[in-house]
Structures are given as structure tokens and as C-alpha cells.
């Protein structure tokens, strides 16, 4: 019996629906199945569909810095409400970035094609450089500006290019635990009070309810894990999920490796033990990115041009070639594309074998 004649073919739209639920590296490999699949998976319809599906399942991206190399893992973020107060997840290894033959390679992102330049914007207020990392929420860049006897929240609207400064509560004194977070689309400032490691810990949070009226709402919580976590290491706030859960993590990578999700609305604390992280990276720095979403359009190496010390570009003495040094010409772009095609991040990512 001819099985091919009796078997019904799967519609292309159903194939795309199935593939949109797979990891990015898997969809990259499936481009090689056939010309038809390669065309469908590179189409803008599929990239938008994949982003929609990926946005519904955000992940926690973990980076570990070890001896000049950076290792990236990711694990699914637990969906609330939780059934248990403690769960165990496995981390997926994604990529290793580091030095090539003990020589640093720098990738320079060029925005636009002509008249690329920086513009200076005068800030009406002088301040010391902020120690806390700034955060951008809904087109407004927030940062803490520190004076001699006060702390201000600097608000820079990217669209109008205007500054606004808000006084920060004196109770929100500067310490190593102070953190700016995106709390449900609003600016949140968190600190841990009298913290000496481990649990329980006291967490304070200020939420900016109205920028124009300078209205803040203050919260205070005491975090106690319901399950027994035998760990006295320092944890700190790294961000908040889109659903409003505050994420706390350890400073260093070693077993057992925990991530904590605190829900202010339900006053619950979930501890997540992540396996596969911390076994070989004892006491190395860890970086976290909350609500990480895979996007097939993020193909940075195909639109990025790099310069290395091996073959520096030949300098021209012509005064009319200044812009040629800043922006690659179209002829050079094609050559650069061929050069970096072999080290494309997405292509390298999809060649990794599934565990």
C-alpha cells in the first residue's frame, strides 16, 4: 500500500502554529528542512507569530561571568498562582561569549545610514554619577541623582527630551540594596532594611503613582520562605515580572542555586531551585534579566559591523571621507555581511544540540 498516497498532508498554517511554540534554535534548524520551510520560517508572518507565542511564556535569563567568558542560561518563570511554595526547574544552556584567540573583538552597532552623530542635551541640575542602574519605562528614563543631603529621581522623557526631578523619600536612603524596578508599568524603588543575609528579610518599596503630582505609595513587607531554605547568602532584588512579582536572587553562582519570586498582592514567597547552574561556576558573578522573550528578528550580527586590531581599516587623507569612517558604505556592507555570516549569533544558537 502506498502510504504517501493515503496520508493527508498537514496544512502550512498548522505547521507554522506548531513551530511557533518551539525554541528559537529549533526553528532555526528547521529552516534547513526544505526551501519551502526556509521561506515560511523567514517570513515576517512567522516572526510575528513566534514573538506572540514567546511573549506569552517569558523566561529568566541568567548570565555568569567566568574568567573573561560569559555563559547564558534561561529557565521558565513560574506562572502564578502557585500550587506549591517551592519548585525545581532545569536551566537550558544557550551560548558562551568570550575572547577569540585571546584577542577582544568589538562589535559596533550603527544606527541609520547617514549623518550619524551624538547630540548633547543640557541637564539643568548637577549631580554625582548615580550608582544605581537607570531604567526606562514607557519612554521615560529614570535614574537617581545624588546630592550632598538629598536624593532625587531624574526623569528624562525621550520623546520630548525634557528633564523633571522628583524628591525621593528620606527613608529611601542609599545603600547597596537600593534598586529601580518596573513595577506594573510604574517606577518602583526597593531597599532591604537592616539586611545581613538569609531570611527573613524586610523589604521596602516606593511606587511612583503620579509623576506630575509627585505621588508615591509606600509598602513594607517581611519575607519568610514557607519551605526550609538552608541558605544564609545575600540575596538582592533584580527586577519584577510583568505580573508584579518581585524577583530576588543570589549574588554568586553555587549549589544550591535559588531564585525567589515575591508577590506583594498575595504576600507569598516562592523559592525556585534551578538545576544546572552553579555546579561549575563557584562564586562567580551572576547577572539576571527578567521577562526575557525570544525574538527571531534579533539577528544582530547581520546588521552589525565590527573592527578588530588584526586588519584595521585604511585611513584616508581626504577631508571628504570623514563620514566614510563613521558609516560603512554599501559596498563594504556586503563584504562585512559575508565576513560575519559564519559568526551570526542566531545561526550559532540554532546549531547547538538539544539536550
From Swiss-Prot:
F-box domain span: 4-49
Compositionally biased spans, kind Polar residues: 306-320
Compositionally biased region (Basic and acidic residues): 321-333
Disordered: annotated segments: 306-333
Tree of life domain: Eukaryota
Coiled-coil zones: none
Pfam assignment, any one: F-box
SMART domains xref list: FBOX
InterPro entries: F-box-assoc_dom_typ3 (IPR013187), F-box-assoc_interact_dom (IPR017451), F-box-like_dom_sf (IPR036047), F-box_dom (IPR001810)
NCBIfam families for this protein: F_box_assoc_1
Protein name per UniProt: F-box protein At1g31080
Annotated source species: Arabidopsis thaliana
